[in-house]
Amino acid sequence: MLQLKSIPPAGAAGAMSEPAHITVRGLNKEFNGSVVYDNFDLDIPRGRFVTVFGPNGCGKSTLINLISGLIPTDGGEILFGGKRLSQVKIGYVFQNYREALFPWMSAFTNIEYPLELMKVPKKERVERVQRLVDHLGVRIDLTLYPYQMSGGQQQLVSILRALVVEPEVLFLDEPFSALDYEMSLFMRDQLQRIFHETRTTTVLVSHDLEEAVYLADYVLLLTRRPARIADYRYIELPRHRGDETLAHPDFIEHKRHCLEVFQREVRRQ
């Protein structure tokens, strides 16, 4: 198992005592001559919920796409508890649920599809999906097809599909951006419950600062390109979080601080 030197996240109080699950060192990436990441380092603690926030075009989605192997790096090293990506299972929830689910498959079949690709026998696939659904207390009709379901239900199916392989890490790329506000609130609650039950290391990209602070154990704030860590804010708020969290003085202070960092980066030339 490979080991890389731990780098305490700047501004993340208490992070030094937490073992890194994802270790990024010397990450490089450019598109058409534009440098997105240049010798970028990052540690993500095990079993924590990390949200990624920053200016438009700074490379938020690119970061999780690089870490998850969806796009190749131009250099650097990424390890998962000392292991290479090929040695770990990951789950990924895409931004557009309408394009992520297969419309000719029922919700249940969509969820079990990754297990079919892994050559898991049918009986075991059914058992694993049912066990996951029961464990998380999901109350939707999985015999329905995606086009028969609400947006939130479709995105929940996408999340279940990502979780059915029992991933070490779950990545979510702006999973609520295509949902209306009411459904976004519902899905925040669902995702919190899933995280509480599984304690899967979770990395979520968000364009909504309130959402980023509300869901996170840590908020990773990025600078403009080439992206650096502007701050890595530890959000010390009790879970389960609800409407009362939004009015809590500590939440308001965390959000104010993150907004200040964000605005500073937006104004930076």
Where are these regions (language model features)?
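A short, proline-enriched helix->beta-strand linker immediately N-terminal to the Walker B motif
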Residues: 164-168
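Conserved ABC transporter NBD signature motif
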Residues: 76-88
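Conserved ABC ATPase "signature" region
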Residues: 116, 123-141, 193
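Conserved ABC ATPase signature
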Residues: 145-149, 153
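Helix-to-loop junction immediately C-terminal to a conserved catalytic motif
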Residues: 68
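The feature captures the beta-strand-to-loop junction immediately N-terminal to the Walker
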Residues: 53-55
